[in-house]
């Protein structure tokens, strides 16, 4: 007999246990069996010993399932993108938060000093009656954004200028004035510009001394028109913009005459990115932030109006006014009693411009660019000076401040302004609404003694005939023309024959003269 005895038959209970265990050991597509899962689950319960094991049994089982999930390397899973609404709410959340004690301090300061913060809710209500709906929710958010601007900068005046739309985003524009002597950014910008100009001049001089330059071109570019100083002309106000309420306010740089002149020749939709390049013809000298500032200056000069008599020139300023000088300041009239709404709608003579007109030169005050320094005059020749004196430009003159709207030029056959009542059903409480047809999106809403200017549009001027880019300039002469390089024209056959006959006659006459002289000499010898 062998040692390996044949096992006897199993007990029925043990056999059922084996069958049950083999059933639990069956695996699915993931390679995991129920036996292994229950073993791991029971081991975790015994190790953690939660007080409510029955209640957390299902949650622990689900956690084990999720922990075993393995994502294949060949499966691409796109990350979950945050919605635009969530991003916008995250940006605007800071507007509605208030630190401990900040509210009480701001209220106490508001009682002591007047705040430059405008009442935007009142403005939105006034505009809504005039048919320009800014929206109550957006008005609240913009008001909170303006409050943040006034809290972080020493402002004397803050005004909501409007909203410029763009293809990829819009701009909220705030028009501000700093307290006297507290605009440090403007002074720093001016110093940097002066340093840059000095460095450029030094580099040019060094390059000229170091290298033998080829002959200089006789072409002289037009003189650079200087920009107006901060606080005057087109740079009278400072502008801040942000992409949406809650975003950071960005200060726009001062505008230059070259940028205004170029903006008049192009049409470009804003993208919502201040650093985006402006690719147009004619080329624009700057990026979108400069184009935005130029368009704001143009829109303000053409659409900011007020009822006649609301503003007046100062008495002291009128006495000291020099002949030919341009008035650029005014003050509110304390004796203004208001103009009835019906009269504001009937005649445009009851409205005036209270922002200076921008001349074709790109400035509000004309500057003579033909006046040159003594060094430049010494270098130039007398003939060139005489030519320049003959071609001296004529001064540009625009309409003065507080000019009535009735003197505005028409756009083809379209009037520049349209005035109407906000409602004809209840005329006693109606408002006067003035809409600009030259700059679509510019509105002025006025009651008897109160008015508001706002612009909500694409920043494009109306052109009835459509836009066509200007033609390129005429090609310049490659070299100066003169008799030294001018080719003579070939003579005709008749001219050649006449010249030949004239030469033959001259030769015959010369021979006769020689013969006569020879005969006279022979006679004298005899």
Swiss-Prot record:
Record field: compositional bias (Acidic residues): 181-212, 374-395, 507-526
Keyword Cell membrane recorded: no
Biased composition range(s): Basic and acidic residues: 497-506
Source domain of life: Eukaryota
GO terms (BP aspect): cilium assembly; cilium movement involved in cell motility
Main location: cytoplasm
InterPro entries with a match to the protein in the record: Radial_spoke (IPR006802)
Coiled coil region boundaries: none
Region called Disordered, residue ranges: 180-231, 371-411, 469-526
Subcellular location: Cytoplasm, Cytoskeleton, Flagellum axoneme
Keyword ATP-binding: no
Keywords: Cell projection, Cilium, Cytoplasm, Cytoskeleton, Flagellum
GO CC term (a single one): motile cilium
Function description: Functions as part of radial spoke complexes in the axoneme of sperm flagella that play an important part in motility. The triple radial spokes (RS1, RS2 and RS3) are required to modulate beating of the sperm flagellum.
Known partners and oligomeric status: Component of sperm axonemal radial spoke complexes.
Family of this protein: Belongs to the flagellar radial spoke RSP4/6 family.
Matches recorded under PANTHER family: RADIAL SPOKE HEAD 6 HOMOLOG A, RADIAL SPOKEHEAD-RELATED
Protein name: Radial spoke head protein 6 homolog A
Native organism: Xenopus tropicalis (Western clawed frog)
Gene from which the chain derives: rsph6a
